[in-house]
């Protein structure tokens, strides 16, 4: 393959994730984006309880029952002359760890905001994570077919709460029952909305020019006058779109529409392929790796168990950073120092898998994993380096887990260790006894673990409360001091799923006192994979 062909393949890749508060319409937008990418023909509606058409990107049992996306799916589709990789992140308020890690694998994010509610709590948290790497953000103000807050107010709120400048690209005409469409500030065109056409790609009527009398006829004189008035304000008060500020994460282009009505999603996609960056460089512990390098490198940011109910398998999701993956290629797994032949990597359309012959920077491929791959693993063509910045967070909630049938202890431990390797939950085994303590960042993770232990490992487990309020990973350079620390604090020490030593504190006061007592021991809140 010639360097120019390779460069062309890299340049057309766009890899992004959608971030939003639960129920802001993320799964619906995912559906509609895939519809435009022609990946699915009729978009499945998400929330209908008991309806057999499940949304394409929610595929685990529990997600199907609850109507929320629990695990990160990956979907690739063509749009214009680009190839877009969309990483779907869990929308429920709990699933933060998986989501945080997914954001390390993308080059750009789409923030979906419910225009009736504005900026919500989860959106704030996720924006903080994108800030760590100055990820470029596009914004979609959703649900214009309902009654929404004043659009100017929404922009002000995003600017003040999320500290990012807003540049409106489209502007709404009416909302709720009176929603007529949007005006495109940079193309000087009005796109008219028709309700009830959400399942397919609409033929949208376009009116050129803001002063076109056809506009008054189409939306009514009152709304047309209101639009012209608002636009004068907008053009006076808001920021112009600047690509450089967008790429530095300082400015977000804002689009208005309704995902359910499939209106406005294509304007956002047009913006995404036009402005979002092609695959970006990534830092390792040795140097920066850029996408145009010939040699292959990539990192694992997520492990997903049982994507195929017929096989008890696990798949490691790897983001390709540089070079081209070819079927049957030999790669070095840096952590273990072993060379492995990757003959059957996968590509995804949420749960439908296809074997991939080749993959380029920006692509996400799945590696079959029988317990040898961990989150954060780097694969190269021999170079010794490790990609950095893939975090593990100290859990905030703890429960003791035990069996209804004590004979299944082995399966329980196996299930918990596998689920912890996947990042679904963290498991701690106290040094002093045989308890198993499960730590999570959100309550829903506990339900997921019990449900998955039952369906995948046939283990019935129940929770009990446990006297643990927080955990910290501990390390120390002074062997003698560390031995003394371990001897005196045996009752509070535990090993996590990867056999790393952690201090599990009954109270914050206890933790603070212990930290004061042993200044030479480092107590860490996060652990790099």
From Swiss-Prot:
Subcellular location as annotated: Cytoplasm
InterPro entries: EF-G-like_DII, EFG_III/V, G_TR_CS, P-loop_NTPase, PrfC, RF3_C, RF3_dom_3_sf, RF3_GTP-bd
Superkingdom of the source species: Bacteria
Keywords from the UniProt entry: Cytoplasm, GTP-binding, Nucleotide-binding, Protein biosynthesis
Binding site for GTP: 20-27, 88-92, 142-145
tr-type G domain span: 11-280
GO annotations of cellular component type: cytosol
CDD domains for the chain: RF3 (cd04169), RF3_II (cd03689), RF3_III (cd16259)
Pfam families according to UniProt: EF-G_D2, GTP_EFTU, RF3_C
GO biological processes: regulation of translational termination
Record has Isomerase as a keyword: no
GO molecular function ontology, one term from the record: GTPase activity
Major localisation: cytoplasm
Similarity field: Belongs to the TRAFAC class translation factor GTPase superfamily. Classic translation factor GTPase family. PrfC subfamily.
Role of this protein: Increases the formation of ribosomal termination complexes and stimulates activities of RF-1 and RF-2. It binds guanine nucleotides and has strong preference for UGA stop codons. It may interact directly with the ribosome. The stimulation of RF-1 and RF-2 is significantly reduced by GTP and GDP, but not by GMP.
HAMAP family: Rel_fac_3
Protein name (Swiss-Prot/TrEMBL): Peptide chain release factor 3
Organism: Edwardsiella ictaluri (strain 93-146)
Lineage: Bacteria, Pseudomonadati, Pseudomonadota, Gammaproteobacteria, Enterobacterales
């Amino acid at each position: 393959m010639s360097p120019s062909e390779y460069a062309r393949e890299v340049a057309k890749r766009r890899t992004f994730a959608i971030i939003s508060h639960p129920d802001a319409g993320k799964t619906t937008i995912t559906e509609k984006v895939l519809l435009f990418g022609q990946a699915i023909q009729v978009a499945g509606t998400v929330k209908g309880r008991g309806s057999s058409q499940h949304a394409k990107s929610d595929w685990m049992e529990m997600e199907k029952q609850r109507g929320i996306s629990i695990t990160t799916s990956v979907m690739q589709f063509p749009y214009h002359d680009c190839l877009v990789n969309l990483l779907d992140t869990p929308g429920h308020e709990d699933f933060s760890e998986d989501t945080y890690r997914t954001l390390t694998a993308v080059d750009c994010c789409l923030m979906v905001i419910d225009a009736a509610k504005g900026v919500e709590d989860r959106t704030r948290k996720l924006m903080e994570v994108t800030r760590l790497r100055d990820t470029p953000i596009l914004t979609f103000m959703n649900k214009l077919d309902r009654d929404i807050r004043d659009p100017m107010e929404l922009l002000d709120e995003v600017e003040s709460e999320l500290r990012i400048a807003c540049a409106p690209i489209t502007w709404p005409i009416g909302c709720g029952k009176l929603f007529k469409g949007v005006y495109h500030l940079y193309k000087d065109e009005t796109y008219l909305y028709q309700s009830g056409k959400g399942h397919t790609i609409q033929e949208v009527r376009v009116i050129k020019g803001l002063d076109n009398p056809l506009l008054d006829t189409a939306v009514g004189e009152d709304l047309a006058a209101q639009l012209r008035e608002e636009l004068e304000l907008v053009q006076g008060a808001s920021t112009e779109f600047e690509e450089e500020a967008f790429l530095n994460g300082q400015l977000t282009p804002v689009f208005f529409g309704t995902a359910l009505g499939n209106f406005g999603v294509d304007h956002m996609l047009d913006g995404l392929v036009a402005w979002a960056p092609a695959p970006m460089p990534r830092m390792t512990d040795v140097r920066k790796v850029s996408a145009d390098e010939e040699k292959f490198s990539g990192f694992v940011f997520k492990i997903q168990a049982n994507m195929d109910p017929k096989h008890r398998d696990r798949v490691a999701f790897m983001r390709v950073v540089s070079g081209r993956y070819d079927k049957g290629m030999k790669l070095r797994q840096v952590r273990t120092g072993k060379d492995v032949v990757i003959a059957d990597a996968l590509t995804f359309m949420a749960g439908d898998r296809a074997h991939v012959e080749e993959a380029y920077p920006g692509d996400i491929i799945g590696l079959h994993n029988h317990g040898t791959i961990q989150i954060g693993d780097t694969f190269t063509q021999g170079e010794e380096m490790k990609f950095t910045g893939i975090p593990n967070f100290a859990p905030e909630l703890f429960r003791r887990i035990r069996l209804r049938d004590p004979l299944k202890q082995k399966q329980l431990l196996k299930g918990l260790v596998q689920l912890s390797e996947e990042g679904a939950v963290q498991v701690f085994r106290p040094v002093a006894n045989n308890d198993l303590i499960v730590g999570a960042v959100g309550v829903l993770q506990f339900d997921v673990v019990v449900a998955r232990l039952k369906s995948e490992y046939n283990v019935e487990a129940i929770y009990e409360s446990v006297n643990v309020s927080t955990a910290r990973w501990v390390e120390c350079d002074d062997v003698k001091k560390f031995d003394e620390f371990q001897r005196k604090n045996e009752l509070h020490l535990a090993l996590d799923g990867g056999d790393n030593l952690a201090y599990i504190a009954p109270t914050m006061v206890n933790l603070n006192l212990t930290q004061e007592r042993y200044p030479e021991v480092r107590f860490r809140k996060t652990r790099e994979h």
